[in-house]
Amino acid sequence: MNRKIENHFLYVEVSDRGAELMRIMRKDTGAEILWNGDPAFWSYRSPILFPNVGSTWQKKMKINGKEYQTRQHGFAREKEFTCVEEGTEKLRYRLMSDEETRKYYPFDFVLWVEFGY
């Protein structure tokens, strides 16, 4: 689901999937600020890269003697975030660790993402 916020100058859309900015448009000119996500080239627009940026050596990491598989740019960009606050000028999202995330990142976490003016 895409959620929207705006003020006098900007119109913004954010996806619950990955808490990713999908659109930033200037209201005065109609100019689009973000890449349009053309899947022929790159379907993302502004992904949140967590818990790692890029790839790890052989797509693995070792923590406390145990090996874990990693994913390029982490997993947050593919997870559904919970929108915990939604207003006309503010969105606040939360992603919490779960059984699936612990397969790749063996720590409990809460990742907060906030958009607003």
Residue ranges of each PLM-predicted region?
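Surface-exposed acidic/polar loop and edge beta-strand patches at domain peripheries
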Residues: 1-117
